[in-house]
Every structure is written in structure tokens, then in C-alpha cells.
């Protein structure tokens, strides 16, 4: 869409293409971000699902970890799904040795909290923020938000009460993968944040 702010998808590892496809379908000027100079060109960023410890190592290796932290602290709208939620959390309860998050979201998360790949599942979630219609959510080796600090807001829980979606200012995080369900409302909600900041 002409005149749309540019939105990046962190393209170090994970389901980058799936997020780009959703963003393009919504008319966004979406691009891959692999280097600090590419990060400087975007008005919003999606951190995709994948493996959070690998993303952390790669971000440090290519010199993106510091610029990402600075951009988040500076108010850049960022949406993290699954591993992206882990990357945005202020605290990783069970990170591997040396693993660091980017921080910004006042939450503590536990990696792979729902179990292994074989225990992945799908369910419908209520999102009053996004409308009355439930959202179909895909959970793949998903994290869980174990605690939510006073600066963050819970957006959704699974039926047993565990938190799976949070928001804080320009930051969004989901333990599930809306890019795989066909429901574009979460990406639309994120784009509203991006447009509101430019």
C-alpha cells in the first residue's frame, strides 16, 4: 500500500515468510530485517516464532541485539509471536545458559511450557480487544506467561487460565501463531499501533 509505514520481520530464524505473507495481504510495506541498517528503516517490527535461544545468539552475532533493545526502549512497535514473545519478555524463567532476552515486556515467561512438538495444539480464544468473534490459535512448543507485571496487560488466556497474550504500550506478545491460523486480526491490531506512532 503506497504511503504505508514500513514494517520489518526479524529474519534471523523462524517463520519469517508466514508473517510477511500476512502483512503483505493487509497491504503493509513489509520487509525482512537482518542487519542494524535495515532495522533503522522500519516503523514497526515482528519477531517471529522459531527458537528463542538461537535468535538470541544470531542477534548478538550480527550486531542486532543492542540496536533492537534501543529501538524497543525508544518506543518502536514490536509484535513477538511464540519465540518472539520470549525475546520481548523482561524475564525468561528457564532460559538456557547465557540466553538473554531483548526485554521491554513486563512479564516472565517459561519456554516450551505446553510440552514438546508432539503436544502442540489448536484452540479458540476470546479476544474482546479484537471483537466478539473468537480467534483460532495455533500453539507449537509454546511458551506461557507465568507472571505479568503492573505495566503489562493480559489480552488472552487459555481455558485453564494461563496467560497467552499480553500488551504493553507499543509491544504485543502472543504464545501462539496467528500467522498460521488465517486470522489476520492480531496483525491488523499491530499495524494500528505502527500507524499510530508515525
Curated annotation (Swiss-Prot):
A Pfam entry, by short name: SNO
Catalytic activity: aldehydo-D-ribose 5-phosphate + D-glyceraldehyde 3-phosphate + L-glutamine = pyridoxal 5'-phosphate + L-glutamate + phosphate + 3 H2O + H(+); L-glutamine + H2O = L-glutamate + NH4(+)
Keyword DNA repair: no
GO cellular component, one term: glutaminase complex
Active site: 82, 177, 179
GO biological process: glutamine catabolic process; pyridoxal phosphate biosynthetic process; pyridoxine metabolic process
Pathway membership, UniProt: Cofactor biosynthesis; pyridoxal 5'-phosphate biosynthesis
Residue sites binding L-glutamine per the record: 50-52, 111, 140-141
Entry keyword set: Glutamine amidotransferase, Hydrolase, Lyase, Pyridoxal phosphate
Domain of life of the source: Bacteria
Alphabetical list of PROSITE patterns matching this protein: PDXT_SNO_1, PDXT_SNO_2
InterPro entries in alphabetical order: Class_I_gatase-like (IPR029062), PdxT/SNO (IPR002161), PdxT/SNO_CS (IPR021196)
Molecular function as annotated in GO: glutaminase activity; pyridoxal 5'-phosphate synthase (glutamine hydrolysing) activity
The protein's Enzyme Commission number: 4.3.3.6, 3.5.1.2
Family statement: Belongs to the glutaminase PdxT/SNO family.
Self-association state and partner proteins as the record states: In the presence of PdxS, forms a dodecamer of heterodimers. Only shows activity in the heterodimer.
Family annotation (PANTHER family): PYRIDOXAL 5'-PHOSPHATE SYNTHASE SUBUNIT SNO, PYRIDOXAL 5'-PHOSPHATE SYNTHASE SUBUNIT SNO1-RELATED
Job description of the protein: Catalyzes the hydrolysis of glutamine to glutamate and ammonia as part of the biosynthesis of pyridoxal 5'-phosphate. The resulting ammonia molecule is channeled to the active site of PdxS.
Name used for this protein in its record: Pyridoxal 5'-phosphate synthase subunit PdxT
Source species of the chain: Leifsonia xyli subsp. xyli (strain CTCB07)
Annotated gene: pdxT
Amino acid at each position: 500500500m503506497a504511503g504505508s509505514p514500513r514494517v520489518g520481520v526479524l529474519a534471523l530464524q523462524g517463520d519469517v515468510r508466514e508473517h510477511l505473507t500476512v502483512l503483505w495481504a493487509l497491504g503493509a510495506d513489509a520487509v525482512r530485517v537482518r542487519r542494524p541498517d535495515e532495522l533503522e528503516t522500519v516503523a514497526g517490527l515482528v519477531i517471529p516464532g522459531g527458537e528463542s535461544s538461537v535468535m538470541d545468539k544470531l542477534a548478538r552475532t550480527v550486531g542486532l541485539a543492542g540496536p533492537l533493545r534501543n529501538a524497543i526502549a525508544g518506543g518502536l512497535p514490536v509484535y513477538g509471536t511464540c519465540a518472539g514473545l520470549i525475546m520481548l519478555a523482561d524475564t525468561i524463567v528457564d532460559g538456557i545458559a547465557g540466553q538473554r532476552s531483548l526485554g521491554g515486556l513486563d512479564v516472565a515467561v517459561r519456554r516450551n511450557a505446553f510440552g514438546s512438538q508432539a503436544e502442540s495444539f489448536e484452540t479458540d480464544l476470546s479476544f474482546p480487544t479484537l471483537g466478539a468473534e473468537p480467534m483460532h490459535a495455533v500453539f507449537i512448543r509454546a511458551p506461557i506467561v507465568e507472571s505479568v507485571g503492573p505495566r503489562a496487560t493480559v489480552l488472552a488466556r487459555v481455558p485453564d487460565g494461563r496467560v497467552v497474550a499480553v500488551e504493553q504500550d507499543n509491544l504485543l506478545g502472543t504464545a501462539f501463531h496467528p500467522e498460521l491460523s488465517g486470522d489476520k486480526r492480531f496483525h491488523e491490531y499491530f499495524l494500528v499501533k505502527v500507524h499510530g506512532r508515525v
